[in-house]
């Protein structure tokens, strides 16, 4: 699947590995994948992918290729232009993945806000997503005013993805008046899921010590810290 290649590149790139020349890490020899294929340039495997996909495939592909600033040739199956066009033309909430895919889509295109070709479309898409995020918050101010639900349950993963998306587009999830009611904010709502003594994030108020919630919570934290330290929009890897 396209997303499997995306994840491999993001994981390896995050560890400082150049996925366009894997033989550097194997005594000059390409690696052999599970199907017996020799793989030296994993980035090329991704941008020349020709199989089926759902929208998360192009979204994560753009993230993966941008993480390592990988060069994509003009004759690739998936150029950056094609990835951007596919993502920008995707209708929010039409994929069955809910709010999480809205915010993941926003994360992928946010670095292109000032692009001379795509910038205006990117900004419009981001603010459309922002409105969807705002509409998703709880309506009971005494319940969880900045929480988001999945299957009727407030989850930390949803909060994590919102923090990443809004930080990427340059919106402060703690101080922006639209995201802070004077008592709570998107950030404080997210931190309610953190167990600082045990060092984990809970999935929900009734599901503690969750692995997925913890790693998403950690990179959302890193994303917000990157936003603060970098003085505005952007990815933590930029």
Positions of PLM-derived features:
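HEAT/HEAT-like alpha-solenoid repeats
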Residues: 43-51, 84-92, 131-138, 188-195
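An alpha-helical repeat/solenoid feature that recognizes helix-turn-helix modules
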Residues: 1-21, 48-74, 89-125, 138-177, ...
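A residue-identity detector for tryptophan
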Residues: 47, 78, 127-130, 150, ...
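Alpha-helical repeat scaffolds
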Residues: 21-46, 73-88, 119, 123-130, ...
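Intrinsically disordered, low-complexity repeat and linker tracts
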Residues: 231-238
